[in-house]
Amino acid sequence: MSARRPIPFVVYKGSGALRLQLLPAEPKEENSPYLKEGCVMLEMSKSKGEPDARGNRIYDWDNKIIFKLSSKDIGDLLAYMKFGAKGEVKLVHDSSKAPGAGDDAGMKNLFVNSTEKSWFWNLSISKEYRISVPVDLSEMVRIQQLLSEGITKIYGW
């Protein structure tokens, strides 16, 4: 396996940003023939408001929400994107139960809702902090393709 990490896919919008990073399968231990399953990390950040002097938006990555997408989560998202793009898909994680849970641990909810030609990715921690990023059709097609291809790398196939 290559030690290089794939390039993250990022969507920047006025309300916030969404970043997907593939973490491929890796060896369980040194010299082990077995692999540890990978994942896709979803990070979302709010916009800090007004653009800087050069017109670039600034995002609050220090207060981002991180959501680890397992192969099952990715399967749920792909099934929604391919077969049920009306309504919403909801994924819930309780990160406080994870070993070594950090300060940002708690109930995390990911909702992906669709309208005619756009999708809204909403990520929240409990009910206290929520980030919403709209995603257009072109971006959603790329997300679907990357997640579909990413499944094979998560399993190391």
Task: List the model feature ranges, each with a label.
Residues 1-157:
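Positively charged, low-complexity terminal tracts
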